[in-house]
Amino acid sequence: MSQIESLSQIEGKLNNLSLLANENIKNAKSDSELDQLRVSLLGKKGELSIILKTMGKLSSVDRPIIGQKANLIKINLQDLITERKNQLISEAIDKQIEDEKIDVTIPSTGTLPGNKHPLISTQDEIIDIFCGLGYSVENGPEIESDFYNFESLNIPKNHPARDMQDTFYLDENRLLRTHTSPVQIRYLENNPPPVRIIAPGRVYRRDAVDATHSPVFNQVEVLCIDQDINFSHLRGTVLTFLKTFFGDIPVRFRASYFPFTEPSAEVDVQWKGKWLEVMGCGMVDPKVLEKLGIDSEKWTGFAAGLGVERFCMVRHQIDDIRRFYTNDLRFLKQF
């Protein structure tokens, strides 16, 4: 009789535990609360484990009955906890959606329009002008060898012209190109004349940063090789380009020196009442052509180079090159 009472008592405790646990799980408000319930109900020291320890008072016939009932209660409580957790997640998502609901009657903030950077638009315009004159665009590596950047352009080692531009050397033989002229040499190695190309791209020089200098800037170089090309063709091409880009603006040519052209000239335009250098140019030195296996008696040509930043500054009356690189929207939104 005592065993029957013990069986009834244990079953009663299990039933009470199940009812109370069901209610607590349904009323739980958070994951952490559910985790605490799981530990207090089903943990090693939980209420279910405490009840099951009293099974030792039962006969071998009754113990399986309690064990089976306890196992069913455990499975049911685990399922209830999982279900309530999923319900809490769903409720949280619904609340977030409700809180973040967009009121379509509120005026939109709009999207700020984007535009090309002034340097990019300036370079694109320069390229378009020369393409209209029959030139094609060629590109080359920014990391160059000493040969392509200097020696192939009639600037051998220890030549005094190398003092004209400080260079970023990566090692004894590799450097960051100081001009885009190496593109012209690479192209001529694989393409016989006649040639009309332009080479746009970034170049690097060890200049101190100030209002008119930057260690990194953009350059466009021009190369024309054909029969019977002379300085008048160079002058005509440069004047046509400058008139197309700047409009009717005073231009002058000044004699100058470059190792890879002879004769050479610098080109100035009037800016704010003063002459400002904007291009360097000249007839390609026959030695440069001969090194490439090109007959300099049959083929002649001219080369010219310009800085995109300088052209952009003149076009838009910008007095400091550093403005191009500060990403100041107050400046950029003007273009």
Swiss-Prot record:
Q: Which reaction does it catalyse?
A: tRNA(Phe) + L-phenylalanine + ATP = L-phenylalanyl-tRNA(Phe) + AMP + diphosphate + H(+)
Q: List, separated by semicolons, the cofactors it needs.
A: Mg(2+)
Looking up CDD domains in the UniProt record yields: PheRS_alpha_core (cd00496)
Q: What class of enzyme is it?
A: ligase
State the compartments where it is located: Cytoplasm
Note on cofactor: Binds 2 magnesium ions per tetramer.
Per its UniProt record, what PROSITE patterns does this chain match? AA_TRNA_LIGASE_II
Gene3D superfamilies under this entry? Bira Bifunctional Protein, Domain 2
In which residues is Mg(2+) bound? E262
InterPro entries per UniProt: aa-tRNA-synth_II (IPR006195), aa-tRNA-synth_II/BPL/LPL (IPR045864), Phe-tRNA-synth_IIc_asu (IPR004529), Phe-tRNA_ligase_II_N (IPR004188), Phe_tRNA_ligase_alpha1_bac (IPR022911), Phenylalanyl-tRNA_Synthase (IPR002319), tRNA-bd_arm (IPR010978)
Q: Name one GO biological process term.
A: phenylalanyl-tRNA aminoacylation
Q: Which residues form a coiled coil?
A: none
Q: Which keywords label this protein?
A: Aminoacyl-tRNA synthetase, ATP-binding, Cytoplasm, Ligase, Magnesium, Metal-binding, Nucleotide-binding, Protein biosynthesis
Source species, domain of life: Bacteria
Q: Which HAMAP family match?
A: Phe_tRNA_synth_alpha1 (MF_00281)
The record's similarity note reads: Belongs to the class-II aminoacyl-tRNA synthetase family. Phe-tRNA synthetase alpha subunit type 1 subfamily.
- What is the recorded name of this protein? Phenylalanine--tRNA ligase alpha subunit
Give the source species: Prochlorococcus marinus subsp. pastoris (strain CCMP1986 / NIES-2087 / MED4)
Gene for this protein? Answer: pheS
